From Swiss-Prot:
Belongs to the TCP-1 chaperonin family. The lineage of its organism: Eukaryota, Viridiplantae, Streptophyta, Embryophyta, Tracheophyta. Molecular chaperone; assists the folding of proteins upon ATP hydrolysis. Known to play a role, in vitro, in the folding of actin and tubulin. One of its GO terms (molecular function) is ATP hydrolysis activity. The gene is CCT6A. One of its GO terms (cellular component) is cytoplasm. This is T-complex protein 1 subunit zeta 1. InterPro entries: Chap_CCT_zeta, Chaperone_TCP-1, Chaperonin_TCP-1_CS, Cpn60/GroEL/TCP-1, GroEL-like_apical_dom_sf, GROEL-like_equatorial_sf, TCP-1-like_intermed_sf, TCP-1_chaperonin. It comes from the Eukaryota. Pfam families: Cpn60_TCP1. PROSITE patterns: TCP1_1 (PS00750), TCP1_2 (PS00751). Gene3D superfamilies: GroEL, GroEL-like equatorial domain, TCP-1-like chaperonin intermediate domain. The keyword DNA-binding does not apply. Heterooligomeric complex of about 850 to 900 kDa that forms two stacked rings, 12 to 16 nm in diameter. Coiled coil: none annotated.
Length: 535
């Protein structure tokens, strides 16, 4: 009532109404996303306001693209998107886990239990589950020569949840090899050094890994070569065109001759820079059939392009800054900001540089490089929907391999961890908890089963039969997951189904925290400043 006195237009939901609104919002968001989970999950079609269509089963993409208005659902969506930003996967799992925690809590609250008691039980269960996760994980040695088979299994598990099996298996090698290509000992892995380029032609199975760089533009001079072998690569950030000064300066002249002299001086300055590059080319290419390629971040004007073309030099201008970094890592050499004191040590090397024309688009390939630490995943597909799906899957696959290398451990997948953690909480942890907080632990434990239940449901299996068979196997001491083909228990290690440790840890950490905060909401007040204005 006090809020109504201060603001008669305020909208207030009290106690049980606020709690049920919160729980229903969490359950509603769970129902939207749960059919996407796992290899057998379905695809959602998002239609934008302008009629554009997006097909995806990636939870992160769905939550970012959907227009969510309910405040509770917005809060859960932000948590799930943060999960993806931190660990690269687990968005859908986070949403359905929070939704299931709220659903389990609703049963207890309807029987008269106070939410605070449930929250205390959640906290106990969360700590116990995190401790259990540290004992359940499988250590993996990731030294200078990491185990590629484990990395492939992790990548395959992730990719199969986004794409059909044949394409996922093909992309597995591409994703693993690209991460190992950019990996340097004792340095963090920078996934931005993997360029993801797409070309809309051919089929999705034509996607390939280029150990080098693919640029989305070509040369701007008709007389320049379209293909060159044994190339010296000059990476530079030098203006080879007339440009205005960065400060407010002006030129003053009293007659036409002075103006012409100024124009000639400006042109001479640019030509001198070009000439220094040509001198370096003549120095390194004399007496052999090597070629010379310039990739410049700044502009090159037509007269300069003409001079370079006469010398047989391939020149590309306006390259992206990120590609300059990738080029140095792929080809070697160093990026230069001045043409003064150019030496052969500044140059990189590529065995092959060629231009590919696709319709009105031009692409330049830099391949056959030595010891590359940057690469390009070239995605191909017949339409934009296919390309977008592959892009989302590849990004998640790259993150999963990176997480495995950094965690140096994996977690058995196919729902094995969730079932094992649930049995641990029910059979061991619950007995040590005093009072009604036991019910909070039990609700948390049952909520963990939402992952294997949803996997079974999406595969068209009977969820009750699946859970009974899995829990009975775990009670016998066998760690098993769910085989989605026949619904039988399967050893995830033999089947090669592994999840990321960091993804599971983040899921167990964030899910109960958000659920606890939502359960303790006893009043929803809509009384912002804009509501005070008379209508």
């Amino acid at each position: 009532m006090s809020v109504r006195v201060l603001n008669p237009n305020a909208e207030v939901l009290n106690k049980s109404a606020a709690l049920h609104m919160t729980i229903n919002a969490a359950k509603g968001l769970q129902d939207v996303l749960k059919s996407n989970l796992g290899p057998k999950g379905t695809i959602k079609m998002l239609v934008g306001g302008s009629g554009d269509i997006k097909l995806t089963k990636d939870g992160n993409t769905l939550l970012k693209e959907m227009q969510i208005q309910n405040p509770t659902a917005i809060m859960i969506a932000r948590t799930a998107v943060a999960q993806d930003d931190i660990s690269g996967d687990g968005t859908t799992s986070t949403v359905i886990f929070i939704g299931e925690l709220m659903k389990q809590s609703e049963r207890c609250i309807d029987e008269g239990m106070h939410p605070r008691v449930l929250v205390d039980g959640f906290e106990i269960a969360k700590r116990a589950t995190l401790q259990f996760l540290d004992t359940f994980k499988t250590p993996v040695v990731m030294g200078d020569e990491p185990d590629k088979e484990i990395l492939k299994m992790v990548a395959r598990t992730t990719l199969r949840t986004k794409l059909y099996e044949g394409l996922a298996d093909q992309l597995t090698d591409i994703v693993v090899n690209s991460v190992l290509c950019i990996r340097k000992p004792q340095e963090p892995i920078d996934l931005f050094m993997v360029e993801i380029m797409h070309m809309r032609h051919k089929f999705d199975v034509d996607t390939r890994l280029v150990e080098g760089l693919v640029l989305d533009h070509g040369s701007r001079h008709p007389d320049m070569k379209r293909r060159a072998e044994n190339c010296h690569i000059l990476t530079c950030n030098v203006s080879l065109e007339y440009e205005k000064s960065e400060i407010n300066a002006g030129f003053f002249y009293s007659n036409a001759e002075q103006r012409e002299a100024m124009v000639t001086a400006e042109r001479r300055s640019v030509d001198e820079r070009v000439q220094k590059i040509i001198e370096l080319k003549n120095k390194v290419c004399a007496g052999n059939d090597n070629s010379f390629v310039i990739l410049n971040q700044k502009g090159i004007d037509p007269p300069s392009l003409d001079l370079l073309a006469r010398e047989g030099i391939i020149a590309l201008r306006r390259a992206k800054r990120r590609n300059m970094e990738r080029l140095v890592l792929a080809c070697g050499g160093e990026a230069v900001n001045s043409v003064d004191d150019l030496t052969p040590d500044c140059l990189g090397w590529a065995g092959l540089v060629y231009e590919h024309v696709l319709g009105e688009e031009k692409y330049t390939f830099v391949e056959q490089v030595k010891n590359p630490h940057s690469c390009t995943i070239l995605i191909k597909g017949p339409n934009d929907h296919t390309i977008a799906q592959i892009k989302d899957a590849v990004r998640d696959g790259l993150r999963s391999v990176k997480n495995t290398l950094e965690d140096e451990c994996v977690v058995l997948g196919a729902g094995a961890f969730e079932v094992a953690a649930r049995q641990h909480l029910i059979n061991e942890v619950k007995k040590t908890v005093q009072g009604r907080a036991q019910l909070g632990v039990e609700a948390f434990a049952n909520a963990l089963l939402v992952v294997p239940k949803t996997l079974a449901e999406n595969a068209g299996l009977d969820t009750q039969d699946v859970i009974i068979s899995l829990t009975s196997e775990h009670d016998k001491g066998n760690i098993v997951g769910l085989d989605l083909q026949d619904g039988e228990p399967v050893d995830p290690q033999l089947a090669g189904i592994f999840d990321n440790y960091s993804v599971k840890r983040q899921l167990i950490n964030s899910g109960p925290v958000i659920a606890s905060q939502l359960l303790l909401v006893d009043e929803v007040i809509r009384a912002g400043r804009n509501m005070r204005k008379p209508t």
